[in-house]
UniProtKB/Swiss-Prot annotation:
GO terms for cellular component: plasma membrane. This is Ribonuclease Y. InterPro entries: HD/PDEase_dom, HD_domain, HDIG_dom, KH_dom, KH_dom_type_1, KH_dom_type_1_sf, Ribonuclease_Y, RNase_Y_N. Residues 351-444 form the HD domain. Its EC number is 3.1.-.-. Pfam families: HD, KH_1, RNase_Y_N. PANTHER family: RIBONUCLEASE Y. It comes from Roseiflexus sp. (strain RS-1). PROSITE patterns: HD (PS51831), KH_TYPE_1 (PS50084).
């Protein structure tokens, strides 16, 4: 009952105390607020003053920097103005100098033009003076021409009166005389041109051929057909023949070669048109003689083995020659046929070595004259390939070889060059003429070929017979071992121009009707002798 009363008292005391404290605070605030406002005002004033001084200091600093920049700019402007002034003065001086030079050059040019104009005026005056002189001379020439025409007419009339010939008759006589003189002059000019052409051609040919031969260093040995086998003793002849001729019959049947056993001491002769079979027989007979066992069985064995050896030798020889000539891609059959030429000779010259020599010469000459080197050397190497089988096939060896080359895949250019190297076909290409040339060079050089005395005499007689078969020929002589024919003609039957035609006709007939190694020179000699006696 007493607790609520106490509580009320406490609340009353607390309220009174709080009321007294609120009043003190109000009074304090009344005095503090003005002081606070005054302090704030003073602080603001001080801050403003400080800020103002700072701003003024910055302004003064900026103004100082601006003055410095202004002074620097003014200094640069002055420098630029000075430099611009100097540059303007320099440019002005240069311009004035150029103007002076241009004026001087213009003055010189005007002076030159003035001199040229004066010279031109003088030349014009000279030309006009010369033109007047020419016109005067033309009038004089015209007058002289008229006078000459009158004189010519008078002379013509006088000549017609004296000679009793009309103008047409006199013209015919003069034309005949001019025609004869022209014909003689033409023949003389033809001889001069042919002489010059021959000299130039010979000079160029000598140069090309000498260069080619100098570069061609192939070895050469003249071979002949070997048909005699030496025997150690005469007793071996009986062993070769054998009992009742068994051995010799077996040998001849197996080799196809005839063995001639005669009175020749210590030697037998082998006879066969096929050089390969003859070589097989020779080697086989030598082996049998060394071995000592000579009977049909042994003969068959040795001949068979020798045939294989000769086949291998021919193949190796063909490959060797193709390699030395640098001719690639040959058919194996062509290689074999090339090797067969090892045992073939022509006028004592080995045909295989002759073919190799022709190939090397053709390659060098083709390189010098710009021809096809591969075609030239291949055709030259194969040009006598027909001789390997010409005893088996009918026809000229050139055409036989061309057909073999065509059948074994050689190009038409090579086939044509092979066929034309003896004029069985007309040469149409440079390479064909080149093969003809190297064939003549290889076969015609001294010591390359030889022939028997009978054939030599018959060939000389045939040359003289061909030359004397023409009309107007007095005599003909084959000289220089048949390499030149000198034809003596009747001077009243053949003139100088006819001598040229006769030389060509004789050479052409020799080419068509005779066979000969190398080339033959035809010389026509026409001699006129006038004889008189002083009494």
């Amino acid at each position: 009952m007493f607790e609520p009363v106490a509580t009320a008292r406490h609340w009353a005391v607390a309220c009174c105390t709080f009321t007294i404290e609120q009043e003190d605070v109000v009074q304090w605030l009344i005095w503090a607020l003005p002081a606070l406002v005054i302090g704030l005002a003073i602080g603001a004033g001080i801050g403003i003053l400080i800020y103002k001084k700072s701003v003024q200091s910055q302004i003064r600093q900026i103004e100082a920097e601006a003055r410095l920049q202004l002074e620097a700019t003014r200094s640069e402007q002055k420098d630029l103005i000075l430099r611009a002034t100097d540059e303007a003065l320099r440019l002005r001086a240069e311009a004035e100098a150029q103007i002076r030079e241009a004026r001087a050059a213009l003055a010189k040019q005007e002076e030159r033009l003035q001199r040229k104009e004066e010279n031109l005026d003088r030349k014009i005056e000279g030309l006009e003076r010369r033109e007047r002189q020419l016109q005067q001379r033309e009038r004089q020439m015209e007058q002289l021409h008229q006078e000459a025409e009158q004189l010519r007419q008078q002379q013509r009339a006088e000549l017609e009166r004296i000679s009793a010939l009309s103008q047409e008759e006199a013209r015919a006589i003069i034309l005949k005389r001019v025609e004869d003189e022209t014909r003689d002059e033409a023949a003389r000019r033809i001889r001069e041109i042919e002489k010059n052409v021959r000299e130039e051609a010979d000079k160029l040919a000598r140069k090309v051929i000498s260069m080619a031969i100098q570069r061609c260093a192939s070895e050469y040995v003249a071979e002949v057909t070997v048909s005699t086998v030496a025997l150690p003793s005469e007793e071996l002849k009986g062993r070769i023949i054998g009992r009742e001729g068994r051995n010799i019959r077996a040998f001849e049947q197996l080799t196809g070669v005839d063995i001639i056993v005669d009175d020749t001491p210590e030697a037998v002769t082998l006879s066969c048109h096929d050089p390969v079979r003859r070589e097989v027989a020779r080697l086989a007979l030598i082996k049998l003689l060394k071995d000592g066992r000579i009977h049909p069985t042994r003969i068959e064995e040795v001949v068979s083995k020798t045939q294989q050896e000769v086949e291998q030798i021919m193949r190796e020889e063909g490959e060797r020659v193709a390699y030395e000539a640098n001719v690639q891609g040959l058919h194996p059959d062509l290689i074999k046929l090339l090797g067969r030429l090892k045992y073939r000779t022509s006028y004592g010259q080995n045909v295989l070595q002759h073919s190799l020599e022709c190939a090397l010469l053709a390659a060098h000459i083709a390189a010098e004259i710009g021809a096809n080197i591969n075609v030239a050397k291949t055709a030259a190497l194969l040009h006598d390939i027909g001789k390997a089988v010409d005893h088996e096939v009918q026809g000229p060896h050139a055409l036989i070889g061309a057909e073999i080359a065509r059948r074994l895949g050689k190009s038409p250019a090579i086939v044509h060059a092979i066929a034309a190297h003896h004029n069985d076909e007309e040469p149409q290409t440079v390479e064909a003429w080149l093969v003809q040339a190297v064939d003549a060079i290889s076969g015609g050089r001294p010591g390359a070929r030889r022939e028997t005395l009978d054939l030599y005499i018959k060939r000389l007689e045939a040359l003289e017979t061909v030359a004397t078969s023409f009309t107007g020929v007095q005599r003909a002589f084959a000289v220089q071992a048949g390499r030149e024919v000198r034809v003596m003609v009747q001077p009243d039957a053949i003139d100088d121009l006819g001598s040229i035609h006769l030389a060509r006709d004789v050479a052409k007939k020799i080419e068509e009707s005779l066979q000969y190694p190398g080339q033959i020179k035809v010389t026509v000699i026409r001699e006129t002798r006038a004889v008189d006696y002083a009494r």
